[in-house]
Amino acid sequence: MTAVTRAPRWVVAGMAIAAVGGLGGCADTWFGGGEDEAPLPGQRLSVLLLERSLEPDPLLASEPVVLPRPLANEDWPVAGGNPGHALHHLAVGDLLDVAWRRDMGEGETDDNLILSTPVVAGGKVFLLDSETNAIALDLASGAVAWERALIPEFEDEDASLGGGVAYGEGLVFVSTAFGDLIALDAASGGTVWQKNLSAPLRAAPTVANGRVFVITYDNRLFAVDAAGGEILWIHEAIIESAGLLGAAVPAVSGDLVVASFSSGEVVALRVENGRQAWADSLIFQGRMGARTNLSDVDASPVIDRGLVIAISQSGRLVAVDLRSGLRLWDQEIPSTQMPWVAGDYIYIVTVDAEVVCLRRGDGRIRWVTSLPRFEDPEEREGLILWSGPVLAGDRLVVTASDGVAMAISPYTGEILGLQDVPDGVRLPPIVANGTMYLLTTNAELIALK
């Protein structure tokens, strides 16, 4: 019998600030260097609106930011890079140029969005496009290895909002907006098993310890046997009717899985049986406004060396001891993006278009860099949505919905380079085997080496 656990019904209650007028000195290659290489086609964009609301701690002004050395990661098998979502500092080249570009299925429309990044494993890139087609691209040949249309018969293709992919044990696990969790053979694309979970799946699954973990739109976390598709247990969180489009991906470390829900709950559960180890709330009630009235959590939690980092769009960032559930510190910072942990620092892109560097140990702010918020800053129209960051090759990379990729110094917050992309980019980059990949809203995959 499948075990079902339910949430308790309690109420989920050298310092530098980068100041840039216009980035006229941006280099011709991606993020600096080499004047002879041709950039992607398109017009350079200037930073026209810079605002700052968060403030660095002045007592940290003289503290140097020291990061771990870049390490090569062969694959990026799940959303967030690995099951715990902590990758620290990834290795890529000093100069990044476009190695290749490929159309990868159907791009976004007004009705259908791509809400999850691709994954890389076993020499292939896997992704789910805006019409629920699962696609595998062979990295050696550049050819499409296989493609599967996964919209159920008699379903409306305009309902393809969300879902994603993960890789593990030779299988590609696909979550869809139609409530299906599907295991495909990574080599052929053939169906190994399929399970309908009776509610839309907005986010990608994650895979660890022979289990697939995925969250439904109605706030149920399923643990499913990766080999055969048997439902092992279900955790039911508080149902929340109002929320954002996406959803958080669970993080796994050892015998615990940590999940954030649209109710504002963040819970740690036993991988084996789904029993709750602890719970916390990410709802911030200190200010009034439309943003804080939403309890939703789209940012995936991070587990790093026994510490859980979780954040909500309403403005609550917490650091929690993984084993005890004790909250060690918190900050009033709003974000829909997964925090990036590197060594003793945490980097966050806020909903207010700021990149923030905090100390991991106590949450104090080291530096803040403001980004453009509007395409038309004078009229305050055309809201720009920023994604990321990813730390690779001594630079933080963030992307923007208006078609910009930007490199920022992780040490000072200085903007190092700016490059526009032919289409918008609403998802953060991913990195595997020394290559950075960007997926545009038009479902074009750009590889940078």
Q: Which residues does each predicted region cover?
A:
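C-terminal motif of bacterial Sec signal peptides marking the signal peptidase cleavage site
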Residues: 22-25
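Blade/loop signatures of beta-propeller domains
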Residues: 38-58, 63-99, 276
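Bacterial signal peptide processing site
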Residues: 27-30
